[in-house]
Every structure is written in structure tokens, then in C-alpha cells.
């Protein structure tokens, strides 16, 4: 069996930056174990498998795998596969069946291999647990306890499909100094995935409002994490006034793969009513695997 795939860089318009993604076309013939093994072979943070949708009203169904496990939802695969489908079908919107639900993405074509996608997150963020003591967090991240927290923002645990420990730090300098090669990580951050999204406000920087880094034992550091940005809508919304607010988060700078994630928040009074994630993606290559 031969399978074809595209390679995209997501949350960027520049090749060899952003977060790389493999998109396997026509994956209906693959079993779950085969998809997991293909994702492990390609060894990117995520690989997307396009399948026939259950409903004819939808563009495609997708399965999302890391090299280690399947995910019900992830932001950079959603943006990347939406751009790939939008360019292929020459359409301005796609409806994608993911395990978390059906996601509608609005597509803007930039050129023959580049596009922009935005989607409303299928579930608004929820508190998913209690954060560790900031002294333990600081020790795990190689920081001082007084560097944990940013203004009114404190550590939280949120999910918009995937659980993250959301850890604000004092400034961009503290964010850049984080080191995770320390023992006891899973004990400090015990919830599934053991994933930490560290972030800070960046009023001194032009072009973005926040900077972030994501760490998880299975992945190491990730260049751009849409599902974490979706979870971050929870605490960020508490800083927003009534109406629509747009933020830009930079990620991946410390890895040499700069990324730009767009976040949109709407509040009606004190109630969070809408969250969206957006960004660019471009096709940088294609290939095939012989599975027999």
C-alpha cells in the first residue's frame, strides 16, 4: 500500500518556520494501528489523516496522531488541514469532523500554496484541575518562585479539548530561560499529557501581545500549539472587557521556528461566549510511504 502526504508549515507564511505538519490524503484504508505507526515514522508533533466524512454536508473527517497517541483535537493540525483542503477544493470554508466534534473553518487563499484559516473552538475552555504550588512550578521550570505569575494572571489548569497547565511568567526574559530537563516533571504536572503552556504578556514587542512556550514529555518543546492557545482563552478572557478582543501569541522563537497564533475572544457582559483560533499555513513539500 502506498500513501501520499503533504508537508505544511503552520502558523507562519515562511517556509521552515512555524510548526510542521504532515497531512495524509485518502487514509480510509488505514487501520488505527497503521495510522499510529505512520505518525511515529514521520515523527512530527502531529500527523493528520484525511478520511471520508460521515455526513455529505462535511468536507472531510480527520484523525490526529502524535508519534505516541491519538488526540481528539489540536489547533495547528486543524489550521493546516483546513488550508490544505481549502486550496485543494478552491473553497472559502470547510467543515471538518474531528473526534471532539465538527469544526467549521473559514479559509482565505493567499497564493497557490499558502492560506489562512480561522475556526471557532468547539468547546469553550473549562477549568480542569488545581495548579501546583508555584514553588514546585518554579523548580520544574528552572525559575525563581517570584517569576511565576504575570500581573493579575496566575497559574491555572484549563482545557478546550486537551488539558494544559497554563503558567504565566514575569516577562519574556523569564520565558526564554525556562529549562525542563529536571526530574519530577510528571509528579509536579500529573494530569494527562503532563503538558505546560508557559506564557507572558509582551507590551514591549510589536506584532504580538503574548509570548508562549509549550512543553510535554512526549513532544519536548512544541513550535506552535493551537489547542493550548484555545485553553488560554479561559484565563485571558478574564482580562477582557465586554465585546470582541483579538490577541496575537508568538511561539517557537526559542526553537528557531517563529510562529504566530491569532486568538479571538468575545464576551457578553462577564460571560465568555466565543473563542476562535486562526493562523497561516503553507505547503512546503509532499511525499509518499510504501507500507507493504
Annotated model-derived regions:
Residues 1-73, 79-292:
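Active-site proximal loop and beta-alpha junction motif in alpha/beta enzyme cores
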Amino acid at each position: 500500500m502506498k500513501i501520499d502526504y503533504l508537508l505544511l508549515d503552520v502558523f507562519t507564511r515562511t517556509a521552515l518556520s512555524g510548526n510542521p505538519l504532515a497531512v495524509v490524503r485518502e487514509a480510509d484504508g488505514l487501520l488505527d494501528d497503521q495510522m499510529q505507526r505512520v505518525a511515529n515514522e514521520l515523527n512530527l508533533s502531529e500527523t493528520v489523516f484525511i478520511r471520508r466524512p460521515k455526513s455529505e454536508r462535511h468536507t472531510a473527517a480527520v484523525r490526529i496522531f502524535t508519534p505516541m497517541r491519538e488526540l481528539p483535537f489540536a489547533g495547528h493540525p486543524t489550521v493546516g488541514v483546513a488550508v490544505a483542503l481549502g486550496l485543494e477544493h478552491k473553497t472559502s470554508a470547510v467543515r471538518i469532523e474531528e473526534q471532539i466534534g465538527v469544526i467549521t473553518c473559514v479559509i482565505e487563499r493567499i497564493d497557490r500554496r499558502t492560506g489562512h484559516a480561522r475556526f471557532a473552538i468547539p468547546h469553550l475552555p473549562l477549568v480542569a484541575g488545581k495548579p501546583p504550588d508555584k514553588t514546585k512550578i518554579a523548580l520544574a521550570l528552572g525559575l525563581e518562585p517570584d517569576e511565576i505569575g504575570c500581573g493579575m494572571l496566575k497559574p491555572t489548569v484549563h482545557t478546550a479539548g486537551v488539558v494544559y497547565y497554563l503558567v504565566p511568567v514575569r516577562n519574556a526574559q523569564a520565558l526564554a530561560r525556562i529549562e525542563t530537563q529536571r526530574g519530577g516533571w510528571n509528579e509536579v504536572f500529573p494530569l494527562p499529557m503532563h503538558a505546560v503552556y508557559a506564557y507572558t504578556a509582551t507590551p514591549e514587542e510589536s506584532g504580538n501581545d503574548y509570548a508562549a512556550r509549550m512543553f510535554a514529555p512526549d513532544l519536548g518543546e512544541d513550535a506552535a500549539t493551537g489547542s493550548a492557545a484555545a485553553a488560554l482563552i479561559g484565563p485571558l478572557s478574564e482580562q477582557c472587557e465586554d465585546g470582541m478582543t483579538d490577541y496575537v501569541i508568538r511561539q517557537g522563537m526559542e526553537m528557531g521556528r517563529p510562529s504566530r497564533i491569532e486568538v479571538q475572544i468575545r464576551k457578553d457582559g462577564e460571560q465568555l461566549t466565543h473563542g476562535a483560533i486562526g493562523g497561516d499555513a503553507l505547503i512546503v513539500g509532499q511525499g509518499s510511504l510504501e507500507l507493504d
